[in-house]
């Protein structure tokens, strides 16, 4: 699983073609080992991410859906994103946040249930698209508050499953 960086939005560009070629080489190599390559959501639109996966076309690419990253980067609503690329979701982060309000900064991560991700609807939508995998709680702070937030997130998620 990785953040590849910013994916080119224009599929006819030289940069896009070069990216697809490099990703295809990598994906074919790791496919020989029975491995998958997952893109973590964030810096690109859901449509661009789906296009890249389909254009590489090796069958072993997927998505780790971090709903907060889509919001933090201002790239879309994670529930709507599932309509676009739900079939490719192979992992999920439980993380919450707010859209950016300062054009020079990312949005703000907050404890699960306190941001813009509608987790009751998000969890329902995950089931609708057939996701049955792991949900990993992610809280990018340190110390005692991180532990408290993770335990609260676990409790919230248990009520939604």
Give the ranges of each region predicted by the language model.
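Active-site beta-loop-alpha junctions enriched in small/polar residues
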Residues: 4-5, 35, 40-44, 68-70, ...
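A short, structure-level motif marking secondary-structure boundaries and short turns
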Residues: 10-12, 34, 66-67, 106-109, ...
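Amphipathic, non-transmembrane alpha-helical secondary structure
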Residues: 17-24, 28, 47-50, 54, ...
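Conserved, mostly hydrophobic/aromatic
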Residues: 19, 37, 66, 92, ...
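A structural motif corresponding to the C-terminal end of an alpha-helix
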Residues: 25-37, 122-132, 160
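Gly/Pro-rich active-site loop or hairpin
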Residues: 69-132, 141-144, 148
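C-terminal helical cap(s) of enzyme catalytic domains, especially alpha/beta-barrels
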Residues: 146-161
């Amino acid at each position: 699983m990785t953040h590849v960086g910013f994916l080119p939005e224009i599929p006819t560009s030289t940069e896009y073609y070069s990216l697809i070629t490099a990703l295809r080489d990598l994906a074919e190599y790791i496919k020989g080992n029975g491995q998958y390559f997952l893109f973590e959501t964030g810096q690109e639109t859901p449509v661009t991410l789906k296009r890249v996966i389909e254009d590489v076309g090796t069958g072993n690419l997927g998505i780790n859906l971090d709903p907060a990253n889509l919001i933090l980067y201002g790239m879309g609503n994670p529930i709507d994103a599932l309509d676009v690329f739900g079939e490719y979701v192979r992992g999920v982060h439980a993380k919450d946040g707010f859209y950016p309000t300062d054009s020079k900064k990312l949005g703000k991560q907050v404890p699960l249930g306190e941001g813009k991700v509608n987790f009751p609807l998000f969890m329902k939508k995950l089931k609708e698209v057939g996701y049955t995998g792991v949900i990993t709680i992610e809280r990018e702070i340190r110390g005692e508050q991180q532990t408290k937030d993770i335990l609260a997130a676990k409790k919230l998620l248990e009520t939604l499953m």
